Each structure stands twice: as C-alpha cells, then as structure tokens.
C-alpha cells in the first residue's frame, strides 16, 4: 500500500513545505513516526485557536456500530472541524501538510481543532476503522481507510498532556508549533499505532489533527 510519507531525512534534516522549510526533530521507522519542529508558526497557532474557539463543542468519536458520531467517556476534550480550504489560513496549512507528507490535500479529512482543559484526556485508541465494526462500510465509502495521522500542537499545557504510544514506549511532550506524524499501513493492532493523550494536569492543551485517507475524502 502507498502511504503518506515525508521525504527521506532523519533528525536535523529540513523538508520542503512549499512556503517554508520544516525541520525533522525525530524519526523512526516500522512504524513510521516523525516529529516536526516548526510546522506552524506561533501566529498561525494563535489564528487557528481564535477561529476555532467560538465553534467548539464536546468532542465526538466515530460510533463504529453506525458510522455516525457520538459522545464517548474516553474522550473529554472540546473540538470542531474546519472544511477543507475553508479560508486562506486553512488553505495554506493544508497545502504545507500535503507538501511535507507528499499526500494530496483532497485525501485528507477536514482539519480538527481540539482543546483539552485540566483533567481532559483521550484514552489510547486506534484511528483506523476496524473491518469488524458494522459502521465501517459507511466510513470507508467517504474515502477509503485512514492510513495516517498528523497531530499539531497549538498550545502546550503547563503540565501533562503528552501524546503516548503504549506499544512503542514512546511519549511526545506537546510543544507549540511542533507536530507528530504516524502512519499505519494495516488496519490492525500490529501497526503499533495505538496512541492517546495523557490527562492535562495544568493549563490547557490545544491541538489540530489531520487524518489522511487512501482516496479522496468526500
């Protein structure tokens, strides 16, 4: 399967983002996990949060039985979605993501912004759609399987809130403007893509998430 993948380069390398160069902080393979240093500027982080704030509501998860969205106790953040290319800021960020990850903008879901207040968390989970779930065919019809995730840190909390990968014994501390990318070539636990957000224990954490699909997302 062809997957989104940044160009070759390890820690310290810079990648062409179209309108700026993006630095690689950390990279590992099998599974592919890449941390970028400066994907967004501080001004872009602020602008995203400002635009998202009035549209926030309790975050939903995909109901795997129906394919619809529903509240779930494992996810306690607030969130919203931007439409693809909704405004100039979103267009610019999505174009940069597409350039760095070498994956078409149209193969991505709308950018989701999430706010985690003190105590909020997201229990470890997989982003792909499980073939055993009744709602999966409806989800796949919109653009095929999810094959990769990009998490961008818009605001770092005072404490807590790390992105964790339990199967990799890996923790990534939120840092404003940084992002973590990971792919999952198979929709199976063997992809080692189990991940979650630790509870925020001080301040607030804001992130933006981009899920990438096999085909054009509709």
Q: For each of these PLM feature ranges, what is it?
A:
Residues 1-218:
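Fe(II)/2-oxoglutarate oxygenase catalytic core
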């Amino acid at each position: 399967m062809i997957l989104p993948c940044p160009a070759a380069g390890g820690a310290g390398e810079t990648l062409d983002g179209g309108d700026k160069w993006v630095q690689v902080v950390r990279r590992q393979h099998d599974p592919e996990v890449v941390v970028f240093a400066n994907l967004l500027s501080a001004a872009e982080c602020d602008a995203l949060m400002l635009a998202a704030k009035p549209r926030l509501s309790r975050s939903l998860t995909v109901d795997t039985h129906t394919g619809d969205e529903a509240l779930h106790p494992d996810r306690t953040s607030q969130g919203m979605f931007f439409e693809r290319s909704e405004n100039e800021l979103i267009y610019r960020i999505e174009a940069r993501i597409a350039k760095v990850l070498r994956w078409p903008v149209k193969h991505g879901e709308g950018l989701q912004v999430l706010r985690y207040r003190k105590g909020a968390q997201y229990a470890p989970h997989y982003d792909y759609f499980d073939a055993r779930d009744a709602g999966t065919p409806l989800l796949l019809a919109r653009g095929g399987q999810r094959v990769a995730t990009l998490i961008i840190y818009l605001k770092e909390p005072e404490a807590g809130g790390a992105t964790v990968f339990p199967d990799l014994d890996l923790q990534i501390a939120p840092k404003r403007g940084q992002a973590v990318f990971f792919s999952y070539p198979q929709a199976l636990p063997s992809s080692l893509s189990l991940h979650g957000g630790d509870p925020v224990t001080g301040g607030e954490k804001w992130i933006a998430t981009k899920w990438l699909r096999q085909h054009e997302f509709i």
